[in-house]
């Protein structure tokens, strides 16, 4: 499948949402979410996702094959476990494994699981919507495109690999399609699966921890190019 060379990101949120809707309309779409990558980028940029709203949007706009959420978890984190249970109730398929704790780090990379599923399920979908800015998935995208699949990357601006951005057929900034995942609320009470109350408190499983390193929403990151590699806190 040839890339859509004429695609240009619209200037406003409504146009960008409409463009994504037009791309996936009535198509067989598989949505894969790299939770660790999504968590880190959205926590730093203070984007809070209503996952229930996002699932409902995709289910209405396309022939949704599945929405698969890849994450490592801490079985002792009550709030994280409740969050994951709510995701499952909302229709998400969880692919998860417990984190591994070492003397100076916590590890829980799910890249291999995501890539294997994307390949094993290739006959079931026409479009793959990947929620991740991780450049490690560039090779996966190249392989799927050779097999005729259309790849959409949805990630946070400034936290996306340049190679991943360039390889995908279409790229959408998460903060430019907010009507998909954010429902206006009259109160601060969450109705459904809202990352504002739960996700920012969950430790990203792929972040290396030591006594000198602490990643918070106030972390200042170096700015080089408008689209740059994700800071190297995610480990293989």
Spans of model-derived segments:
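Domain-level signal for Mg2+-assisted phosphodiester chemistry and nucleotide/NA-binding surfaces
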Residues: 2-110, 150
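General structural signal for secondary-structure boundaries
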Residues: 50, 175-178, 227
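Nuclease catalytic cores that cleave nucleic-acid phosphodiester bonds
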Residues: 75-210, 214, 233-235
């Amino acid at each position: 499948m040839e890339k859509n060379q004429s695609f240009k990101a619209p200037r406003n949120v409504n146009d960008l949402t409409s463009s994504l809707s037009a791309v996936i309309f009535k198509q067989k779409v598989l949505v894969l979410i790299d939770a660790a990558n999504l968590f880190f980028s959205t926590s730093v940029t203070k984007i809070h996702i209503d996952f229930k709203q996002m699932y409902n949007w995709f289910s209405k706009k396309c022939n949704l094959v599945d929405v698969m959420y890849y994450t490592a978890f801490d079985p002792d984190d009550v709030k994280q476990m409740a969050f994951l249970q709510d995701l499952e109730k909302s229709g998400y398929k969880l692919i998860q494994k417990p984190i591994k704790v070492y003397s100076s780090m916590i590890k829980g990379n799910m890249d291999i699981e995501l890539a294997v599923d994307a390949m094993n399920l290739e006959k079931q979908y026409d479009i793959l919507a990947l929620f991740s800015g991780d450049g490690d998935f560039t090779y996966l995208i190249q392989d799927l495109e050779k097999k005729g699949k259309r790849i959409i990357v949805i990630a946070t601006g400034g936290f996306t690999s340049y190679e991943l951005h360039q390889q995908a057929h279409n790229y959408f900034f998460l903060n430019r399609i907010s009507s998909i995942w954010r429902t206006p609320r009259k109160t601060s009470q969450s109705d459904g699966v809202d990352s504002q109350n739960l996700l920012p408190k969950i430790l990203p499983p792929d972040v290396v921890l030591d006594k000198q390193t602490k990643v918070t929403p106030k972390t200042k990151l170096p700015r080089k190019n408008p689209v740059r590699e994700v800071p190297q806190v995610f480990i293989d």
